[in-house]
Design a protein with these regions (language model features):
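Positively charged n-region of N-terminal signal peptides that target proteins for export
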Residues: 1-6
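Bacterial N-terminal signal peptides
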Residues: 8-16
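C-terminal juxtamembrane segment of a hydrophobic transmembrane alpha-helix
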Residues: 18-21
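Beta-strand-enriched cores of mature, soluble protein domains
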Residues: 23-159
């Protein structure tokens, strides 16, 4: 009986140590990406269909492409709310995202140059960022006259 009394605390300690090592903290990854390219907007009534295609690079996925599509509501001025989905694809992986509520493109008085701000929730990631979670902060510009856009993406992802 005495041996059993000593064995129980030792077993309990072993279980606690193995459980603690299995519960490691998520790894934090600072993500920065810069992309530029062409965007098209097709207006039908107050609905704007948006397509964006560009090139650039992002942390851990490398050089590659941005592809996104969505819709906006041009009846709300000067800041047009929009939403959609897209991908950031590089040699070392792909990030799939969807736009969170609150994204907008705010135009100048003539509706030519827009400042774009959005938060993009990662829905899936592959390659070096497989299983990464987080939200990308997107800040950029869009020129409606020539279709050009530039966007900087930043985030602290967890994996």
């Amino acid at each position: 009986m005495r041996k059993l009394t000593y064995l129980i605390p030792i077993l309990a300690a072993a279980v606690l140590v193995s459980s603690a090592s299995a519960l490691t903290k998520p790894k934090k990854i600072a993500f920065v990406g810069n992309y530029s390219g062409q965007a098209t907007t097709l207006v039908n009534g107050s609905t704007v269909t948006i397509t964006a295609k560009g090139n650039g690079s992002g942390t851990m996925i490398g050089a590659g492409a941005l592809n996104a599509q969505g819709t906006g509501d041009s009846s709300q001025q000067p800041c047009v709310p929009f939403g959609g989905t897209g991908t950031l694809t590089g040699a070392s992986g792909t990030i799939y995202f969807k736009t969170n509520a609150g994204a907008s493109g705010c135009g100048d008085e003539g509706g030519h140059n827009f400042t774009v701000k959005a938060y993009l929730a990662i829905t899936k990631a592959t390659g070096k960022l497989a299983k990464a979670k987080g939200t990308l902060r997107a800040v950029g510009t869009y020129n409606r006259d020539d279709g050009s856009f530039q966007v900087k993406l930043t985030a602290t992802l967890t994996k």
